[in-house]
């Protein structure tokens, strides 16, 4: 996330891109920080309480779907932003791949919520009892 912000600042300066003009590069770092850092801190806390990784198949499905979605979405955001800064038109392919990224994120989050729901309903939540009762 921080590297994306640095890239945005330096790349737009290097290309003499007008300050204040919008490009997808300007929001790529916030997307990476929110989707890649802050949400994973939440996922980590929920893992600690409910031991979600016990359900290996659900957890692995969530992990890979979500991360592939974030990479596709932010990758296309950066590609679109670079094209904007260079004064070139974006095309439908970039929008389509970004849309696939959003779908992967949505499916990944859905799998995560299914896993969380199952873990909440289970009488023994693995590490939850040990850490809550300690």
Please describe what each predicted stretch is.
Residues 1-134:
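Hydrophobic alpha-helical transmembrane segments of multi-pass integral membrane proteins
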């Amino acid at each position: 996330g921080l590297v994306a912000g640095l890239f945005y600042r330096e790349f737009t300066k290097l290309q003499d891109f007008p300050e204040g003009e919008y490009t997808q590069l300007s929001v790529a770092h916030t997307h990476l920080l929110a989707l890649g850092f802050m949400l994973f801190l939440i996922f980590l806390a929920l893992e600690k309480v409910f031991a979600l990784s016990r359900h290996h198949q659900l957890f692995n499905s969530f992990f890979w779907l979500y991360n592939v979605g974030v990479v596709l979405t932010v990758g296309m955001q950066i590609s679109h932003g670079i094209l904007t800064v260079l004064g070139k038109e974006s095309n439908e392919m970039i929008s389509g791949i970004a849309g696939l990224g959003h779908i992967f994120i949505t499916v990944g989050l859905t799998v995560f919520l299914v896993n969380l729901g199952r873990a909440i309903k289970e009488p023994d939540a693995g590490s939850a009892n040990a850490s809550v009762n300690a």
